[in-house]
Amino acid sequence: YVVSENINGKKTVTSAEYYTFAELALIILNVSTVIGELVYKEKQLNTINRIKMSKVSERTMIFSKIALGIIISILQIILVYIYTTLILKVNWGENTLKFILLFIVFGLFSSMLGAIVGISCKTDTAVAGILNGIMYLICILGGCFSTRLMITKVPILNKLMYLSPIYWINTAINTMICGLDTNLYLVSIMIPIILSFLLFSYSEIIKRRGESVDD
């Protein structure tokens, strides 16, 4: 891979750099399927053993799985960092710690997504189907399967791409690599946090409705 320079002498994004971070986002999003299956299986195990989980114990179980997902995400980030720097010779630059923090926060969202889908679905097939569908949509809009330039040329996708957290992650990282001074990094950090909060709020509403029905 060759590092190119634009007319202003600022560094542009190479294909190796672009797909390093785009595919890392895809890898971390895959953590949602792992967490979703774990949450579903634990829920089913409690059902088989006729153990009715209290609201507190269910929340504790969800948080423990989310913590596991974050740990898995951190390990994935470390592995990708080692591989891309040593093998692909990708230079993460002076913003390495910011990039790592960004992907850890995205790991929080991915884990929360998997946990909420896992606790909400009644079959493991539904868990896998819903998460795979969400993953595909987020990734295709975010530029994991093609460059963002190609997405902007598709009439419908160039409107929907703003809904993908991966789009904001890729855009923020690319601007930082190019040395541009924007607030996109803050935006890309806040979006996964806000989405995680919304998912948690949704799960609380569902549980309260379930408790009112049981009563």
Positions of PLM-derived features:
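Short polybasic/polar patches that bind polyanions
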Residues: 52, 84-86
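Interfacial helix-capping/hinge residues at the ends of transmembrane alpha-helices
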Residues: 45-49, 80, 114
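Conserved short-loop catalytic and cofactor-binding motifs
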Residues: 35, 88, 157
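Transmembrane helix-boundary elements of multi-pass transport/secretion proteins
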Residues: 1-53, 58-75, 94-95, 178-186, ...
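Membrane-spanning alpha-helical segments of multipass transporters and channels
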Residues: 81, 91-215
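Hydrophobic alpha-helical transmembrane segments in multi-pass membrane proteins
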Residues: 26, 30-34, 68-84, 106-111, ...
